[in-house]
Amino acid sequence: MEMLYGIMPEISLLLSALIFQLIGAYSNNTLTHVIAKMAIGFAAILIAILVFHPSWFNGIYWNNTFIVNQSKIYLKIIILIFYIFLTLIYSGYIKVANLKGHSEYIVLMQLGALGGLILVSANDFMVMYLGIEMQGIIGYILTTFNYNNSRSSEAGLKYFILGTVFSAIMLFGISLVYGTTQSIRYDIALHALQNPSSDMAVLVAAILMILVGVLFKLSIAPFHMWTPDIYDGAPLVVVALFSSLPKISVLALLGNLLSELKFASDAFFYIKTIIMVLACLSLIVGAFGALLQQSIQRFIAYSAILNLGYAVLALVANSSNVIRAEISYFYIIIYAASMLGFIAIIINNFTNRANYLKISHLSGLSNVKKLSSILIAIQMFSLVGIPPFAGFISKYIIFTSILKSGMYELIIMGIAAVVIGSYCYLNIVKVMYFLPATVRFQNSSVNFELSLVSIASTIIVISLMIICMLFGEGLNVIV
């Protein structure tokens, strides 16, 4: 029985998802709002238990294949908080759009959160594959959720084909790892790189295959090709999901893998260099790609590529065999909060037109929706990295860490990406405040759920900066 304690949050999420699905099926989706409230309440209880009783779950389970410690509990709490935000966004969306709603959407999101929790604690390649595939399959389904729209169906098919190809590459890599090391545990398989053997080339190739699958999920160039089309075709509420839960959990997975790889110093140096180059390529692709976009959803896609480039760079951009995971996680949390707040405001103000909206449609928004415009401006300023918002401190930490490592060429590239990205984000502020309106805005009532997400995300990007300023010593430790 003690072996089940470590996965009680995961078991609880799975069982509650099954209960919510049964309620939705027998009520013919008439209780979607009730199910949403139940899901939020359940996640809040789970967060409270993890916060106040973390010792209940700490431990190493099933022969070191599943690990729960304090840092992993923090990540699980963050994933559950973003799951609550996503449920609020969907609940608010079906209210403002006057839709019946589908309880299975909430269930699928909850299973996506479950996959994220599994990825955070996985110390075994098959457990990792289970978590990634759980999130992947849910992503395929949700992309096509607007099944009456051809763009949504096309995006879902593209995502499914590309996702299965990269999943197969990852699975082939896992099989080669087992064939060469007789183990699929991270610590045993990856530490085998310390001992030169005739199978070394095969093992390195296998690890690179696994990392290719992980970088695909993170939209790191050149494995980003799916991101703009899928974001553009999926409903905006699904884009909100793609911008948060999978990115946080898969980044945590990459941090776990690199933390074990660092013990094989020679192989780790080359693998780290490859990832660093790809992260820099993501900065270029994301910055210039966002520069050319008119569609808000494609803009969000290239923004994801750009910001994941920074997050991955934060993991590996140092001169020693050290993984700065806390810097990377801090950055991606701020990015995800800013993007969810932005998406919630768009849905709240444009309702049925929120999907496939263009940046030009935001022109003149400040004349009609002053508070919404202020909140969007704050999110954009944070994404640019303008003080006093948290986006500034996250970029400052990354650049300071790189500077201490003496990698000045990365500093130059990072600053160039910031400058180009600044134009993209500030262009939205310019459109809202300085261009005349091109569409008629609806004088709809303010939705509570969407407003709560937009305000909460704004509080996050402001309060994290204040916390860092008040606790300067803690900040110095991170840097």
UniProtKB/Swiss-Prot annotation:
Principal location: membrane
Question: Which molecular-function annotation in GO is an example for this chain?
Answer: quinone binding
Tell me the compartments it is located in: Cell inner membrane
Membrane topology according to the record: Multi-pass membrane protein
UniProt superkingdom:
Bacteria
What keywords sit in the KW lines?
Cell inner membrane, Cell membrane, Membrane, NAD, Quinone, Translocase, Transmembrane, Transmembrane helix, Transport, Ubiquinone
- Transmembrane stretches, by residue range? 3-23, 40-60, 77-97, 102-122, 125-145, 159-179, 200-220, 234-254, 268-288, 299-319, 327-347, 373-393, 409-429, 452-472
Disulphide bridges in this chain? none
- A biological process (GO) annotation for this entry? ATP synthesis coupled electron transport
Q: ATP-binding: present as a keyword of the record?
A: no
EC number in record: 7.1.1.-
**Enzyme group, top EC level?**
translocase
Q: Which family does it belong to?
A: Belongs to the complex I subunit 2 family.
Q: Cross-referenced NCBIfam families, in alphabetical order?
A: NDH_I_N
The protein's job, in short, is: NDH-1 shuttles electrons from NADH, via FMN and iron-sulfur (Fe-S) centers, to quinones in the respiratory chain. The immediate electron acceptor for the enzyme in this species is believed to be ubiquinone. Couples the redox reaction to proton translocation (for every two electrons transferred, four hydrogen ions are translocated across the cytoplasmic membrane), and thus conserves the redox energy in a proton gradient.
- Quaternary structure, from the entry: NDH-1 is composed of 14 different subunits. Subunits NuoA, H, J, K, L, M, N constitute the membrane sector of the complex.
Q: Which HAMAP family match?
A: NDH1_NuoN_1
Q: From the Swiss-Prot or TrEMBL record, give the protein name.
A: NADH-quinone oxidoreductase subunit N
Q: Which organism is it from?
A: Orientia tsutsugamushi (strain Ikeda)
